[in-house]
From Swiss-Prot:
GO terms for biological process: carbohydrate metabolic process; cell division; cell wall organization; lipid glycosylation; peptidoglycan biosynthetic process; regulation of cell shape. It comes from Cytophaga hutchinsonii (strain ATCC 33406 / DSM 1761 / CIP 103989 / NBRC 15051 / NCIMB 9469 / D465). It is a peripheral membrane protein. This is UDP-N-acetylglucosamine--N-acetylmuramyl-(pentapeptide) pyrophosphoryl-undecaprenol N-acetylglucosamine transferase. GO terms for cellular component: plasma membrane. Its EC number is 2.4.1.227. PANTHER family: GLYCOSYLTRANSFERASE, UDP-N-ACETYLGLUCOSAMINE--N-ACETYLMURAMYL-(PENTAPEPTIDE) PYROPHOSPHORYL-UNDECAPRENOL N-ACETYLGLUCOSAMINE TRANSFERASE 1. CDD domains: GT28_MurG. Belongs to the glycosyltransferase 28 family. MurG subfamily. It catalyses: di-trans,octa-cis-undecaprenyl diphospho-N-acetyl-alpha-D-muramoyl-L-alanyl-D-glutamyl-meso-2,6-diaminopimeloyl-D-alanyl-D-alanine + UDP-N-acetyl-alpha-D-glucosamine = di-trans,octa-cis-undecaprenyl diphospho-[N-acetyl-alpha-D-glucosaminyl-(1->4)]-N-acetyl-alpha-D-muramoyl-L-alanyl-D-glutamyl-meso-2,6-diaminopimeloyl-D-alanyl-D-alanine + UDP + H(+).
Length: 369
């Protein structure tokens, strides 16, 4: 019997941490199961995956690709050229690497790579993170072997026979966050036993959330609440002056497990990764959907929870006036905290990564027969 060749897998996508970290979680789970597997990432040149993926121990190729700007921009004139150039480079990558499967996790690079893989006869799989599918994934769904989703009723967008309900991949240290509870407050320079609000706006930051907190810091201090405030890299320099004994300001948090462990209430954008992590840790949260995303998918993500009393939602336009007031209200209301915590846990899928990897190898092994 001939020796089976190592599995060769391409994972494509990125642009934000919300796409990159789930992709790395999938890669890590594949490596844990089959250590000799060869994994290649394909991302967008100049985006954060070009640093984060090598830091996680994987090789990555970059495509000259970006999204269409909503405002009139010279960059938009180059978009068709970028798509064509990226497609042909993706074809070359696929033909050289010869993958058993190509996985798209969303982000600019996902579309040309999966199109190239489909055209080359390579099996493909989409991991759709949001409750509202984007244009690219809807177009790709016609040819992929499977679509791993995190929300119900995705038959609105995809062929029902291809949908696999897996949940979104989350890093193992987040799933095991309770192990990091001891010493979590002191890790961030905060005091145990004091009501703690954790504010996060994603790796790049959220202007409206930051403005809302900045305007109302005195109210939070006067209420006896301490704050861990993750500003994002674009806003940190202008906000670091507020760092104090009870307000800890940071641009980025690597130890999200500890941040979740010590938080009583969390304020967050409503990206798919954030919601998946919040569901697993089961902490009461207030979601402020970003209005600057395709198809307004963050609002749809947030509504999926708020309609089930699994989160509170504050519209971005209302956040400067309402967000901190809502946070103070929730910090004082133990019954509301309990209800939100109980309901958001029903959305948790701690085994999502393993479910996705199971489907990946089911497809590969079927094709290898």
């Amino acid at each position: 019997m001939p020796e089976q060749k190592p599995y060769r897998i391409i994972i494509s996508g990125g642009g934000t941490g919300g796409h990159i970290y789930p992709a790395v979680a999938i890669a890590n789970a594949i490596k844990a199961r089959f250590p000799d597997s060869e994994i290649l990432f394909v991302g967008a040149q100049g985006r954060m995956e070009m640093q984060k993926v090598p830091a996680a121990g994987y090789n990555i190729e970059g495509l000259w690709i970006s999204g269409i700007q909503r405002k009139l921009s010279l960059d938009n004139l180059a978009f068709p050229l970028k798509v064509i150039a990226s497609y042909f480079k993706a074809k070359k990558i696929v033909s050289t690497f010869k993958p058993d499967i190509a996985i798209g996790v969303g982000g600019y690079a996902s579309w040309p790579l999966l199109q190239a893989a489909n055209a080359s006869g390579v099996a493909t799989l989409i991991q759709e993170q949001n409750s509202y599918a984007g244009v690219a994934n809807k177009a790709l769904s016609k040819k992929v072997k499977a679509i791993c989703v995190a929300y119900e009723r995705m038959e609105r967008f995809f062929p029902g026979d291809k949908i696999v309900y897996t949940g979104n991949p989350v890093r193992k240290d987040i799933v095991d966050y309770k192990k990091y509870s001891e010493g979590a407050h002191t890790f961030f320079g905060l005091k145990p036993g004091v009501p703690t609000l954790f504010v996060m706006g994603g790796s790049l930051g959220a202007r409206t959330i930051n403005l809302s907190i900045e305007r109302n810091l005195e109210q939070l201090k006067n209420a006896g609440i301490q704050v861990l405030w993750q500003t994002g890299k674009f806003y940190y320099e202008g906000l670091k002056q507020y760092n104090s004994e009870t307000i800890k300001v940071t641009d980025f948090i690597a130890d999200m497990n500890r941040a979740y462990a010590m938080a009583d209430v969390i304020v967050s954008r409503a990206g798919a990764l954030s919601i998946s992590e919040l569901s697993i840790v089961g902490k009461p949260c207030i979601l402020v959907p970003s209005p600057n995303v395709a198809e307004d998918h963050q609002t749809k993500n947030a509504l999926a929870l708020s309609e089930k009393q699994a989160a509170w939602m504050v519209k971005d336009m209302n956040a400067p006036e309402e967000l901190v007031q809502k946070a103070l209200e929730l910090m004082k209301n133990q019954d509301a905290q309990h209800t939100l915590s109980k309901n958001i846990l029903t959305f948790a899928r701690p085994d999502a990564t393993e479910r996705i990897v199971n489907k990946v190898f089911e497809i590969i092994n079927t094709d290898r027969k």
